[in-house]
Amino acid sequence: MIFTPTQKELFNKNIEALGNILLKESLKEIKSSKFELILGKDNLDINLKDTSDNTFLYENVIDELNSMLNTYNDKYLLYPVLYFYGFGNGILFKALLQNKNHQHIVVFEKDIEIIWVMFHILDFSSELQSARLMVLNTNKLEIQDYNELCSSKPFFQFSRIYFLELMSHYYERFHEDILGLNKKLAENFKNSIVFHGNDPLDALQGIEQFVYNLPQMITHPSYKELLSKRKGVSDTAIIVSTGPSLTKQLPLLKKYASKATIFCADSSYPILAKHGIKPDYVCMLERTEITAEFFNHDFGEFDNGICFIIKSIVHPNAINYLTKKTDNFTIVSTYASFIQYLKLDYFGYFNMGFSVAHMACYLSLHLNHKNIIFIGQDLAYAENGNSHPDDYQNSANYESQMYEHILTEAYGGKEKIKTHHVWLMFKRNLEQDVQKIQKYLDTKVYNCTEGGARIEGTIEKPFLWACENLLDKDLNKPFEKLEPLSLNKQNEFLLKAYYKVCKSIEHCRDFNDNFIKVYDKIKNSFMSLQNSQKNEIFIQEIIQDIDKTKTQIDELYNTQKDLIQILGPLLTQFELNLARIYVLNPKTKEDAFNKSILWIKEHLEFMELVYGHIKAQENALIKNILPLEEKLKERKLDKWMERVRK
C-alpha cells in the first residue's frame, strides 16, 4: 500500500501522540500490509480488505457504525470507560468520544497492521494525546500491564460494569485471544478488589489483634534490630513452603541446611522439626486461629536459634504459644493505616504480600540475599489430589475439596495441572513481584519445587542443581542474637501506644456523634419527599448533603488514618456497587426520579454501615487495650496512664 506525503505526515502525528511506547515502536517497524483500503462514497465508509483470505473488516460499514452508535448512546451513554476488542477503522471511537461522559476508551488489537493503515487515514492525535483513546497490543501485554490498568482510576472504580465489545465479525477469528484477554482482565479486576480490601470485618479483626499484640511487639526485638544485625550475612535464601512436592526435597535440604538461610512458612515449621532440619526464620502472616496452631508444639532445644518473624495482626494464640517456648521473635507490621497512625515506626514495616511465602521472599530481599530459592511452592494439587505433604499438620488433603479446581500451566510448561482460585491469586502476585525483582534488583529467583504450577519469571532448576551451584560454604550459624530495647525505651513506646489507642477511641466517639446528626438530617429530608413540584430541587439538596458527607469521609485519609482502615473496604465495595446505578441512563422524568431515589437509598444504607463499623471499632479498641493496660500496671506506670486518659 502506497501512502501520500500528507498521509505519512498524519501517521507520524498519530504516532507522536501515542503514549504506548512499545506499540509506537512496533508500528514504526511496519513497512507494508496485507490490508487493502476500500473507500466508499460516504466519508465515513472506510473499510479494509484482508488480502490473505479476501475477507472484510466490516460487512456494511455505515450500517454497523450506526447500529453501534445507537446502542452505545442508548445503553452506555453514561459509562466512564468502554472496552473494545479490535481497532477497526477507528471512526466509532472518534464519534463516541464526543460524549464527555466517556473518560476513556480502551482498545485491544491483535493485528496492529490495521492500526498502521488507519493512522495514515484519520487523525486520532487529540484522542491519543489526552489518553481518552488507549490502544494496547494484545501480543505484547505483560502481567504488569494488566495489573496497572485494573488497579488504577477510573478503571478499577467501574470494574463491576466491565464488558468487552467486539468491533466487528472479522475479529471472531481471534476468539482464543479474546477469551484469554477477557479472563485475564476479569481476574486482575478481582485481584485489585481483594488488594483494596473486600471485607471490613477482616480489617476489624486486624485492628483488634494488632492492638492486643502491642505489648509483645514493643517488648521484643524489633525489625530494625533484625536488619541492623542480619543484613548481608548470607547470599542465598531457601524459602520452604508446604506444597505436596516438599517431601522429596527434604533430604537435600537437610544436607545443605548449613550453607543457606532457611526461611520456612509457619505450616512447614512442624514438618522441618520432625525431620530435624532447623530453619533460621519461621514466618507467620495469617490472622486466623487455625494458623496459630502451627506454633502449638514443644520442640525443646530444636527452637534454640530460630527467629520467628510474625505479622503484627496474627491471632494472639500464636504469640501466647511462642512466649511459652522462646523470646526470640520479632513482630512486624505492614503499612496499614491504623498501624501507621500509631507511629511506632521504630518497629518497622514491610509489604508482605498475600501469602507467607510472599512474606518470606520480601524478608529475604530486605536481608540482601542475592539468590532466592523456592521449594514446596506448588500452588497446585499433586497427581493424587493432595493439597499438602503427608506430614502436613491439618492433613494432606486439607484443601483438596475446599475450592473448585481450575487448570493452569504446570512447572516445566509441558502440561496443565489442577489448582484453585486462591493459589492462582498468590501465583499472579508472586509473578508480578518476581518480574520487578528480576528487572530492578541484582537478585535471581529460582523455582526448585520440581512440581506444581509454573511461576512465570522464576528460573526453573532442579533443587540439586541449585544446591551444588549456589551453596558452597557453611554459614556462621546461629546468626547473631537480637536484643529488645532497654526497659526505659520500652516503657516510652508502651505509653505512646496507649495514648494513641485512647485517642482513637475518642475519635470513634466524636466521629459518630457528628455523623449521626448528618444522617438524621438526610433521612428526615428523604422521608418528607412528596410528589410535588419542589421534588427536583429537594432531591438535589439531599444529594448535595450526601456529597458533602462523602467528602468528609474521604478527608479521613489525610486527617484520621485510624478510622480509614475499617472504612476503606466498606468504601471500596460501596463505590463498586454504586457504579451500576451511576451508569443507568434515564429516558423520562420518572426514570430520573427513580434513579435519584435509588441513589439516596443506597447512600443512607451506606451511612448506617459507616456508623455501625466505627462503633464496632470503638468497642474492639476498648476490649483489646486491656493487655496494654496490664503491662503498664505491671511496670508501675499507673499514674502515667491516668495522665494519658485525662
Sequence positions of predicted segments:
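N-terminal donor/sugar-recognition subdomains of glycan-related enzymes
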Residues: 1-237, 244-261, 270-274, 281, ...
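Long alpha-helical, hydrophobic tracts
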Residues: 252, 260, 342, 346, ...
